[in-house]
Structures are given as structure tokens and as C-alpha cells.
Amino acid sequence: MRPSGRAADALRSISLTRHYTRHAEGSVLCAFGDTKVLCTASVLAKVPPHKKGSGEGWVTAEYGMLPRATHTRSDREAARGKQTGRTQEIQRLIGRAMRSVFDLAALGEYTVHLDCDVLQADGGTRTAAITGAFVAAHDAVSTMLRDGLIAASPIRDHVAAVSVGMVDGVPVLDLDYAEDSSCDTDMNVVMTGSGGFVEVQGTAEGAPFSRADLDAMTRLAEAGIARLVQHQREALGLA
């Protein structure tokens, strides 16, 4: 039995609350159980230097955790004067995930800048950030269409993410902190709505995992992401 009482293939309770803040072109509070991430999408009328004059836009992300998002307080990275390697890794992952489903030429020379701030962490913050950031980005694009900044949506597909792992030899979906801190294998999977893999990050924390374990975990992730995409569609009124 999992600590939460969930079945091995069960997601936590998922919610995607749109228009959570007032000023951003897109904002979503994404909750995976007790993990809560505020995802905002801002439209900027500029692009990074490597895109200037190309006619293409850019999608990028920043990620951070509030000081008391975890069991004990941690200093703000701004107070320490630099980002941790973990923060840099996660925000690059979010950016790659979003760009995988954007047609940058259709975006024009605009940047969609995503800010993902963890309000409360109970495992799976990066997967919640990706899943919520897509909905925020979708709302930002809708704002651009409404305001006549672009002629057609640059979004080609949905993208979402979930964690999977091996706990006592059993593949489980959407690990919370208790499972994440004690599992033998921890894996994060990012996929598109059409079933394409964007990223697979897997590490054996204890016993090495077999090819059969890998296949079982990716199948579990695929099924979980299909359900997350359905949550996105329902939140956006597309279901």
C-alpha cells in the first residue's frame, strides 16, 4: 500500500486553476496533491539575441521555490546571489518542454516567458510546473490572438509531465515526497498529447532497474500523461 493509499497507477488529485493572478497574460495554480505551483506566462515584445531578425519567437522559463515551500525554511536564491544547479536544470527542462510544442515561426518575434514558483512542495514540482505552464502559455497565446499580435496559434500540441518510480519492486505513478525520498528509482517523463516523448530523466537511487522496469515505468507514465492532458483540455474548455 502506498503511503497515500493510492493505487500504483493513480495520480494524485489534480487541479488547474486558471486566471489565478490578475496581471499576467496567462496564470495557473497547478496542484498535484499537496504540491502547488503558480505558473504565469508573460508576453514580451522582444526575443533573445540569437533570434533577433529571424522572424521567430522564443519560449523560456524560470523556476523557483518559496522559502517555506518545504518542511524547513530555505534561503531565497536571490539572497544567496546565485541559482543552484537544480534550479537551472529544472527551468531549462520547462523551457525545452514548452518549445517542443510551439511553432516559433508562427509566434513571430515575441517571447513567452514562463515563471513557475513552487508555493508548496510534496514531490513532483517540476512535473507540476510543466503541466501547469502549458495551460498558462495557452492562455497567453489566446491573449495574443485576441489582441491581434499573431494571426494563428503557434501551439501544435499539448505537453505534460509526470514522475514514475520503483518502490519495493513495484512501478508507481506520480510520487509524493515520502515515496520520492525512499524509492529505488525516480524518473520524470515529459510527453506531448499525441504521445511523443520530449524528455525522460531516470536515476536508480537504490537497486539498478531492468529494461522490463523501464518499459513498465514508461507505460505507466504514458497513461498518466494522457490523463493529465485530459485535465488540461478540461481546464481550457477544450474537452
UniProtKB/Swiss-Prot annotation:
Domain of life: Bacteria
Keywords: Nucleotidyltransferase, RNA-binding, rRNA processing, Transferase, tRNA processing, tRNA-binding
Signal peptide interval: none
EC code: 2.7.7.56
GO biological process, one term: tRNA processing
Gene3D superfamilies in alphabetical order: GHMP Kinase, N-terminal domain
Positions contributing to phosphate binding: R86, G124, T125, R126
Record-annotated disulphide pairs: none
Function recorded in the entry: Phosphorolytic 3'-5' exoribonuclease that plays an important role in tRNA 3'-end maturation. Removes nucleotide residues following the 3'-CCA terminus of tRNAs; can also add nucleotides to the ends of RNA molecules by using nucleoside diphosphates as substrates, but this may not be physiologically important. Probably plays a role in initiation of 16S rRNA degradation (leading to ribosome degradation) during starvation.
NCBIfam families: RNasePH
Assembly, per entry: Homohexameric ring arranged as a trimer of dimers.
Name of this chain's protein: Ribonuclease PH
UniProt source species: Cupriavidus necator (strain ATCC 17699 / DSM 428 / KCTC 22496 / NCIMB 10442 / H16 / Stanier 337) (Ralstonia eutropha)
Gene that produces this protein: rph
